[in-house]
């Protein structure tokens, strides 16, 4: 494992911890899209079908369990916790996320590295993760005002993907035959979706003002 992969994993883990801190400590999910969280839960469920059959390392299995467990717990909190669910803005979070799921599934059935159930589901998870942030970004544009923890959560998610791109570049030049077009293209699309948010995030940090996205 290289430093970029480790930085990506730790940044991803930090993003989850920030969101759990907001939900568990403040007992609020205001500004958080349940649609995006449900998509992430589906991403990890379909990606880690091999969790109990293919052992790579203790680190790898631990990270899989953490991301799978945390994503499901966040969805549970937002749907069922008697206090947290009251802060969920259902009227604003109206992005039809099934319109993301179905095209990603069809694309995975057509474009994959091997036509097996696990491989198609893994490919589906890659495509879905690339666009899973869209309901969250739409929600933020509608509400405009973004609290610090939500802003940090989204920034860390974008940073995680950026580190993974650096990881791929590093491995391309240091490992023979390291070519994964599906992962690369999906990861690049995912990173580009954060570009607008990054711009306003750094402007807010530079000017020491509250983070707001244009409507």
Curated annotation (Swiss-Prot):
Bilayer topology annotation: Multi-pass membrane protein
Cited Pfam families: ER_lumen_recept (PF00810)
Biological process, per Gene Ontology: protein retention in ER lumen; protein transport; vesicle-mediated transport
Any coiled-coil regions, as ranges: none
Transmembrane segments: 3-21, 36-53, 62-82, 99-112, 120-139, 152-170, 182-202
Residue ranges, Lumenal side: 1-2, 54-61, 113-119, 171-181
Keywords: Endoplasmic reticulum, ER-Golgi transport, Membrane, Protein transport, Receptor, Transmembrane, Transmembrane helix, Transport
Superkingdom of the organism of origin: Eukaryota
Alphabetized GO MF terms: ER retention sequence binding
Chief localisation class: endoplasmic reticulum
A Gene Ontology cellular-component term: endoplasmic reticulum membrane
Disulfide bonds: none
Residue spans, topological domain Cytoplasmic: 22-35, 83-98, 140-151, 203-215
Intracellular or extracellular location(s): Endoplasmic reticulum membrane
PROSITE patterns: ER_LUMEN_RECEPTOR_1, ER_LUMEN_RECEPTOR_2
UniProt similarity note: Belongs to the ERD2 family.
PANTHER family xref list: ER LUMEN PROTEIN RETAINING RECEPTOR (PTHR10585)
Stated role: Required for the retention of luminal endoplasmic reticulum proteins. Determines the specificity of the luminal ER protein retention system. Also required for normal vesicular traffic through the Golgi. This receptor recognizes H-D-E-L.
Name of the protein in its database record: ER lumen protein-retaining receptor
């Amino acid at each position: 494992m290289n430093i970029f992969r480790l930085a990506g994993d730790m940044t991803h883990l930090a993003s989850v911890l920030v969101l759990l801190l907001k939900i568990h400590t403040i007992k609020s999910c205001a500004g958080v899209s349940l649609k995006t969280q449900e998509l992430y839960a589906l991403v990890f469920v379909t990606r880690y079908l091999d969790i109990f059959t293919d052992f790579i390392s203790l680190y790898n299995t631990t990270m899989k369990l953490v991301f799978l467990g945390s994503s499901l717990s966040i969805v549970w909190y937002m749907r069922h916790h008697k206090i947290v669910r009251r802060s969920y803005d259902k009227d604003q979070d109206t992005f039809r996320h099934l319109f993301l799921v179905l095209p990603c599934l069809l694309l995975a059935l057509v474009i994959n590295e091997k036509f097996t159930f696990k491989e198609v589901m893994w490919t589906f998870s890659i495509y879905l993760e690339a666009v899973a942030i869209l309901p969250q970004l739409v929600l933020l544009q509608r509400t405009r005002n973004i609290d610090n923890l939500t802003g940090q959560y989204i920034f860390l998610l974008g940073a995680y993907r950026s580190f993974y791109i650096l990881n791929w570049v590093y491995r391309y030049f240091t490992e023979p035959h390291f070519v994964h077009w599906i992962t690369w293209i999906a990861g690049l699309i995912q990173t580009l979706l954060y570009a607008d948010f990054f711009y306003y995030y750094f402007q807010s940090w530079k000017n020491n003002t509250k983070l707001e996205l244009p409507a």
